Amino acid sequence: MSLSIVSYYGSQQSKCGYCAGANCSLSHGMHAYQLDCRDYQDLIDRGWRRCGYYCYKLRNQETCCPCYTIKCNGLEFKLSKSNKRILRRINRFLRDGKRESKPEAGDGDGEADADYAIVAPEVTASEPQPQLPDKSPPVINVEQVASLATAQRKPTKQATAAAVEAPTLGSNKSSLLSSSAAAPISNKPCKKAKQMRLDRRLAKLGDSASYSTKSLTQEKTLRDFLNTDSETNKHRLKLRLIHVYDDEFRRTLPQSFALYKKYQISIHNDPPKDQDAYKEHLQATPLQNEKPWDGPEMGYGSFHQQYWLDDKLIAVGVIDILPGCVSSVYFFYDPDYSFLSLGTYGSLREIELVQSLAEKVPSLKYYYMGFYIHSCPKMRYKGKLSPSYLLCPETYEWLPLTDVIRAKLDEHKYQRLNEDPAARDVNEFLMEHLDEVKLLLGGRTRTDYKHFRQLRGTVSDDDIIIEYSKLVGKECARRMLYVK
């Protein structure tokens, strides 16, 4: 694992990007110098979210607009009539080159096409950019800390010698006996390889037979709708997935920044930002580009998925690829192509990416859409992707987004969600875990809270460290380095 290093800011108060209220958005914030992708997966499963290097978690019981982390199971995803309508519209445009000025009357299923209603991203995971704290985090040499950590992990000569001298499992009869007791050996005879091959062949024949009877009535899948490229098409749509620090990102930066600026001005009426602000918002990332042998080909980390229509960049999806999900960070597109409902199309493409990645990494089967804000009607669109799940803000368990939960949120904007009063957070940080919290002192010395307290005696910021540890959970508190 890579090293995660964070500096906790504490409680924050700012203008709300959803209801536009002044100083009513309440959150906890921290700066992430760098994050292991597994640690960030654990953090977003506790309600955290990142914007560049800044990570924040809403104080849902107090804030004006409670935010619930939402995800969709990509492998069980069901296309709605509205989804199919949009996919057919795009396929017709690619095939014939004809623009439809508006959706056909009566072709909907009760779902509004927000791209036509307010020309805004309608099924994307984009959130308003959080207001960053005024204070700057302590300056540390991340590379130096990481190299020291690597050196500390290398075995010493004494440790190596001890390992050589240690008896093997086979040299100790009692250890073999205890091993057998722990894992009972099955009495069933092992199948021969030839028999196993025959069983697999029969299973395949059975699958193909059952498929042939179902194929006539089987509905088209998301992949069926997306795989319609043809040499006779008037337009060609190509997707490119590039890491945010690749040469290809730098080469296409002028096009992506120009597109972002056009989107911000036209869609959100925001003043144009300079290129540095764009990079700080949508390129900067604390996530390390990790490429484990059992991970996806491109590895984990932060990426831009670019949509090229012929030779023109028309949309960009900013995503994090993590061990358990594709997390959508932001999506922007060319307003000239709003008739294609690119906001929804981008989400469908990102779900298809989840389905593709899950073929190699089965655990990577979820699509995270950021926050579901029920008290803000324009942000309820995220719940239309099915099946969707909301994160309980107290037990951190996932619960299906049902009409029952929607009704509860209609009654009161903050809800525990998990109705079992006995349910607890399995990753809850308790005072007995305090000694194990990892610290980084003076930008270079790694220790834990127990040794730090022995060294310093009374610790003045106990409460802050405890608050941080409760928010990130006991596992991340044990792994991540808290900068002091």
UniProtKB/Swiss-Prot annotation:
It catalyses: an N-terminal L-alpha-aminoacyl-[protein] + L-arginyl-tRNA(Arg) = an N-terminal L-arginyl-L-aminoacyl-[protein] + tRNA(Arg) + H(+). Keywords: Acyltransferase, Transferase, Ubl conjugation pathway. Its EC number is 2.3.2.8. The keyword Iron does not apply. One of its GO terms (molecular function) is arginyl-tRNA--protein transferase activity. The keyword Acyltransferase applies. Pfam families: ATE_C, ATE_N. InterPro entries: Acyl_CoA_acyltransferase, Arg-tRNA-P_Trfase_1_euk, N-end_Aminoacyl_Trfase, N-end_Aminoacyl_Trfase_C, N-end_Aminoacyl_Trfase_N. Transmembrane segments: none annotated. GO terms for cellular component: cytoplasm. GO terms for biological process: proteasomal protein catabolic process; ubiquitin-dependent protein catabolic process via the N-end rule pathway. Involved in the post-translational conjugation of arginine to the N-terminal aspartate or glutamate of a protein. This arginylation is required for degradation of the protein via the ubiquitin pathway. Does not arginylate cysteine residues. Belongs to the R-transferase family. This is Arginyl-tRNA--protein transferase 1. It comes from Drosophila melanogaster. The lineage of its organism: Eukaryota, Metazoa, Ecdysozoa, Arthropoda, Hexapoda. The gene is Ate1.
